[in-house]
């Protein structure tokens, strides 16, 4: 751990050259031209740049290229997907899918880079929080806003880590100490306190939704409130058997519900009219030949739409020189097409093939199935041309997050399908995908409020379900029915509404380890790997032994001189 933290102190340098390395020269002379930790953190502008550095650190947990981003990790472990990827690739993905190191025993460090990226982000937040009182603030509003966002970023990073590994070091100051793993309750207490700080301190009008074109991506007080509700429900399910007890940090069920109701009553958010318009690939209204300019006919609601409460932003400015800005999990999900740009979809690596069980959960007339899943069997010649290179082919792929194509006019006047990124700076389809990861939608707040016992629970559930069965003319199709707002029905609705959004696995764990392990288990399920039938078995006992948590990277245990201990079952 100690050596790794030394690396983190270097990686905490700010983007765009605003900070340089804080090393000691033999003369020990302060730089007159560059910023470092001794002459920085003076002005409010320094505070703003510090906040940007914290956002950058958080973004790099995805754009930094870990072996598995949190999104891919959780989708692989859920019952929504199989690991997939190429038929001759290493089987590290299958370790996650089966919760079984026997799939590839040498992969003892799968999550080492992800671990380091998260702690690098935490280091930046800690350093800014530690130094904030030394800044000459122009006004308290800016201070409250910037620090509120920073506390929220730290909380989100710790929430991701404690859900993934459970037993992690808790660092609340910028330190190089070799810190042992904390009691999870201590981590959750900090998460609650940080998010509460953000909900209290960030002004309600700091980033109005009406101005999303200029402020989208900033964490608002409502995003912090929504995350508090999510944290409460996860903790209550995993540690309190869904009994509605108070959790560490003093967060209660009533308070979590009040946060959801405050978001709903704010008037800032609402449901996008049609579910499919939430996603670029799903909002394609094109008919006819696939060579058409399908993007021009998209009904996509756009980034920062009225339903988005919290998202992690990306862009296409990344390169291989340390500027890491793209969404690295999108290309992993793309159709594996041997380098071809096929149909309206761009190329990818074929990870996270959709479990047919997930494709079967949607009722007749539920628009969410088509908006969420690519039916590869409906793509012209796809199976004949491409599945020989695909592992764990199921006939289905994720549509919500997938690379896209566009039609480009060549110099001779002909047209070609190319990657949607071609012509945009580096245009590298592997590192420049810029679709945002939407972390919290208004629909989630409605369903969390229902689950937490709102007096409007039935209305909130109906609102979400009606949207799923709404036709293009705005009317409900004949398949819509009202279902009662029981906890079990709400959980089933969440499976349909939030499929492939990085939510399902956590929802399964909070239903109880026995329920989760049996939902995820597979018994001789037949898939195609390299075009040949393969039986997949996922033993529920493997999940139970590990309690649903991931392997602590061996490198981190070694660097800590054994202070860090491996999780049970790994």
Q: What are the residue ranges of the model-derived segments?
A:
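Bacterial Sec-dependent N-terminal signal peptides
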Residues: 3, 15-43, 191, 229, ...
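Bacterial N-terminal signal peptides that target proteins for export
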Residues: 1-9
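Conserved, well-structured interaction surfaces
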Residues: 36, 43-64, 86-165, 176-189, ...
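An aromatic- and glycine-enriched ligand-binding surface/loop that stacks and positions planar moieties
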Residues: 23-92, 196-197, 218-392
């Amino acid at each position: 751990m100690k050596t790794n933290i030394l690396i983190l102190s270097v990686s905490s340098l700010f983007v765009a050259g605003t900070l340089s390395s804080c090393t000691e020269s033999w003369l020990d002379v302060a730089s007159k031209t560059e910023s470092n930790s001794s002459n920085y953190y003076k002005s409010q502008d320094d505070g703003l740049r510090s906040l940007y550095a914290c956002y950058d650190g958080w973004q790099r947990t995805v754009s930094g290229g870990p072996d598995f981003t949190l999104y891919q990790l959780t989708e692989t472990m859920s019952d929504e997907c199989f690991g997939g990827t190429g038929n001759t690739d290493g089987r590290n993905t299958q370790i996650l899918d089966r919760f079984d190191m026997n799939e590839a025993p040498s992969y003892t460090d799968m999550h080492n880079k992800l671990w380091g990226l998260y702690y690098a982000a935490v280091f930046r937040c800690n350093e800014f929080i530690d130094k904030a009182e030394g800044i000459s603030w122009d006004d308290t509003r800016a201070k409250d806003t910037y620090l509120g966002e920073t506390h929220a970023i730290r909380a989100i990073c710790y929430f991701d880590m404690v859900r993934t590994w459970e037993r992690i070091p808790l660092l609340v100051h910028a330190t190089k100490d070799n810190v042992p793993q904390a009691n999870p309750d201590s981590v959750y207490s900090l998460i609650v306190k940080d998010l509460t700080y953000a909900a209290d301190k960030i002004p309600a009008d700091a980033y109005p939704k009406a101005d999303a074109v200029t402020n989208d991506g900033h964490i608002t007080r409502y995003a912090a409130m929504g995350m508090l509700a999510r944290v409460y429900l996860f903790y209550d399910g995993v540690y309190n058997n869904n009994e509605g007890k108070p959790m560490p940090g003093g967060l209660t069920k009533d308070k979590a519900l009040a946060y959801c109701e405050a978001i709903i009553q704010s008037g800032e958010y609402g449901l996008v009219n049609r579910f499919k318009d939430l996603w670029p690939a799903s909002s394609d209204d094109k008919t006819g030949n696939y060579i058409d300019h399908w993007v021009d006919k998209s009904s996509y609601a756009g980034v920062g739409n009225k339903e988005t409460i919290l998202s992690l932003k990306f862009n296409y400015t990344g390169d291989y020189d340390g500027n890491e800005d793209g969404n690295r999990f999108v290309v992993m999900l793309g159709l594996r097409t041997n380098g071809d740009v096929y149909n309206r979809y761009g190329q990818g690596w074929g990870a996270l093939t959709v479990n047919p069980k997930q494709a079967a959960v949607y009722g007749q007339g539920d628009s969410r199935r088509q908006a969420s899943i690519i039916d590869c069997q409906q793509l012209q010649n796809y199976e004949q041309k491409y599945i020989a290179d695909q592992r764990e082919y199921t006939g289905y792929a994720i549509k919500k997050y997938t690379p896209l194509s566009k039609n480009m006019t060549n110099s001779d006047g002909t047209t070609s399908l190319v990657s949607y990124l071609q012509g945009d700076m580096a245009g590298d389809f592997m590192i420049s995908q810029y679709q945002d990861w939407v972390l919290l939608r208004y629909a989630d707040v409605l369903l969390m409020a229902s689950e937490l016992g709102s007096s409007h629970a039935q209305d909130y559930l109906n609102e979400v379900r009606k949207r799923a069965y709404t036709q293009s003319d705005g009317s409900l199709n004949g398949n819509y029915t009202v279902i009662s707002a029981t906890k079990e029905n709400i959980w089933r609705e969440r499976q349909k509404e939030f499929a492939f959004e990085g939510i399902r696995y956590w929802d399964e764990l909070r239903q109880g380890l026995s329920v989760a392990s049996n939902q995820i288990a597979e018994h001789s399920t037949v898939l195609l790997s390299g075009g040949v039938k393969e039986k997949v078995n996922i033993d529920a006992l493997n999940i139970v032994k590990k309690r649903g948590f991931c392997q602590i990277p061996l490198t981190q245990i070694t660097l800590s001189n054994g202070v860090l201990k491996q999780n049970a079952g790994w």
